[in-house]
């Protein structure tokens, strides 16, 4: 029954996930008990004990463990192209990857995703509608999963002064070095395939650090609380950042 509703995936981190066949974000297989219980009751009028469903899901996890690993993103994903470029007269070259598209999961109930590239941004739902109307293949997108801390982002709207407006909301000016640091951090935060800088906010108590931080975070990943404080040494800081 579960396989009629979901495809199963093993992520590169070893997570065993179920992906709705009609589209949507990946979920932990072990979290499907309430969904399957409700489905059985509404479709067949029967009530099955949790232990029975747990046994079935354990079996499904065992089968999924045998699958090849697949990349599953959290909030954002980056697709890249491999390029070889000639660097010297001897013809030696270096192969490197450059980002082609950034995908951002809005965390909404309809699984909306924003695709960003050098030409701008678009909603995947709009792209798929255009593809459907013209009988073309749907644009592919990375597979996303969500955690309990993932909160929805608003659907973006086009604006000619979005950067200036954000600076005003943060209580800064567009040319303020502080705003430029925040802006750079926001842009870097979605490039999950490379090391990214941390944003440390310092200042006296009551200077607005928490408010500024929460407002900045709300652009890419809304949350009710800030991250941790400085550690005792660099190793503590790196440990904290690696889990954020």
Give the label of every model feature segment.
Residues 242-244:
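Conserved P-loop NTPase "ATPase switch" module shared by AAA+ and STAND
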Residues 38-42, 55-62, 164-168, 188, ...:
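Charged/polar, solvent-exposed surface patches and flexible loops
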């Amino acid at each position: 029954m579960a396989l009629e509703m979901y495809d199963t995936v093993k992520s590169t981190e070893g997570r065993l996930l179920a992906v709705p066949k009609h589209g949507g974000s990946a979920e932990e297989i072990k979290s499907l008990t309430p969904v399957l219980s409700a489905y059985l009751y509404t479709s067949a009028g029967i009530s099955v004990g949790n232990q029975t469903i747990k046994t079935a899901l354990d079996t499904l996890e065992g089968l999924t463990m045998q699958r090849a690993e697949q990349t599953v993103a959290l909030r954002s994903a980056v697709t890249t192209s491999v390029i070889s470029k000639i660097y010297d007269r001897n013809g030696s070259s270096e192969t490197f990857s450059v980002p082609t598209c950034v995908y951002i999961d809005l965390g909404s109930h309809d699984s909306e995703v924003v695709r960003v590239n050098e030409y701008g941004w678009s909603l995947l739902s709009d792209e798929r509608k255009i593809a459907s109307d013209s009988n073309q293949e749907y644009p592919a997108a990375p597979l996303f999963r969500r955690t309990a801390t993932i909160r929805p982002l608003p659907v973006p709207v086009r604006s000619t002064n979005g950067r200036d407006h954000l600076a005003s909301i943060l209580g800064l000016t567009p040319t303020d070095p502080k705003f430029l640091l925040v802006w750079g951090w926001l842009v870097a935060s979605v490039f999950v395939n490379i090391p990214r800088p941390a944003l440390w906010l310092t200042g006296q108590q009551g200077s607005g650090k928490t408010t500024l931080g929460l407002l900045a975070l709300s652009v890419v990943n809304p949350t009710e609380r800030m991250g941790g404080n400085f550690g005792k040494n660099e190793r503590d800081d790196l440990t904290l950042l690696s889990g954020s």
